[in-house]
Amino acid sequence: MNRRMTALAAGLCAALAVPAQAAPEMSLARFECGTPQAPTPVNQRFSDTYAYGDLKLQFVYSCYLVKHGDDYLLWDTGHAMTAPNVAPKVSLVDLLAKINLKPDQIKYVGISHFHADHTGQAASFPKSTLLIGQGDWDVLTSAKPPGNANPAPFASWIKGDGKVEPVPQDKDVFGDGSVIMLYTPGHTPGHHSLLVKLPQMGPVFISGDLMHFHENYDTNGVPSFNTDRAQTLASLDRAKKIVAANKATVVIQHDARDVDKLPAFPAAAK
């Protein structure tokens, strides 16, 4: 018995002596993925209760790069380079080149939803695994997608040339809880937001288009063009609880007032 206990104790000591695996290096960078236009009225289009009066806001078009160890997630791909008036001044491929990254180094392209200002440059990353909400993927691959869902940027994945993972609910992207795609439907059927837990800055909640500006978020405003009002309100409620529970910084992708919450590219939050 004593020999057995001694052997067990020795094994336990050996196990405890194995150093814990170091947490992967993480960072979050913002790209400008479209050309902002003059401030525009938001009352009717962005509130189905006409809540915003004469409010005018300038919209920005944000994409994000998450570094997780040696892996990268690109969150949204902005406007196409051919988009009239709002096309980016610099392509995502050229922006990535500034930090010595090539398209085939991007492991995942995560899409918040299927609208053109979030999907325009997806085709530049055909070797990346596409992460997109199941509901949105179903729309894109349907016989007659609606006009606001353009399948063209996803042609390689639709044909089966690239790997796609339709996401029906939440997805722990890297398997360690540090980057989570959050199911927040309502704006589109499969809409997702993103929670990134940075070691220094702390958790960051990236909205997608769950809300377009802080007045949307603060008042539970529902745009008139959302696909489901009840889902939108439920998603806003869930998002606020996630933000509170994680003490997360809220970054609204289209709100120009949130651009400075992250360092200016090529710097990144850590």
For every predicted segment, state its role.
Residues 1-9:
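Bacterial N-terminal signal peptides that target proteins for export
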Residues 9-17:
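Bacterial N-terminal signal peptides
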Residues 16-105, 134-183, 201-208, 244, ...:
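Metallo-beta-lactamase
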Residues 85-132:
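Active-site metal-binding motif and surrounding structural segment of the metallo-beta-lactamase
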Residues 82-83, 91-92, 131, 186, ...:
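Short, electropositive alpha-helical surface patch
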